[in-house]
Amino acid sequence: MLKHVVMCKFKNSASESAMSEVEKGLEGLPAIIPEIMEFDFGRDVLRSERSYDFALVSGFENLEKMERYRVHPAHQKVVAKLREICDSILLADFEH
C-alpha cells in the first residue's frame, strides 16, 4: 500500500470558514474517488511552535491509483483551496 501524507501551516490570515471549506471538500473525496482506500485528516491538537496546523494521510493500492487520485478534478479543486490558505505545504509518499 502507498501512503500519501500532506501537512500544512495555515496563513495567519486564513479564516475559520476557509479552513472549514477545505475540510468539507476533503470529507467528500472518498465518495467521489474510488481509488482512495484510507483517508484521515485533521487539525493539530498540540499547537506547538514546531507543529504544522493540519495533516492528511491517505492510502492507495498502488502508484497508478494514487496518480488517478492526484489528477482527479475533485482533488485538484481542494488542493487549489488549500494552497490559498497555507504558507507552507509538505508532502511525503511512501510504501507501507
Identify what each model region corresponds to.
Residues 70, 79-82:
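Short, flexible helix/strand-to-coil boundary loops that buttress conserved ligand/catalytic motifs
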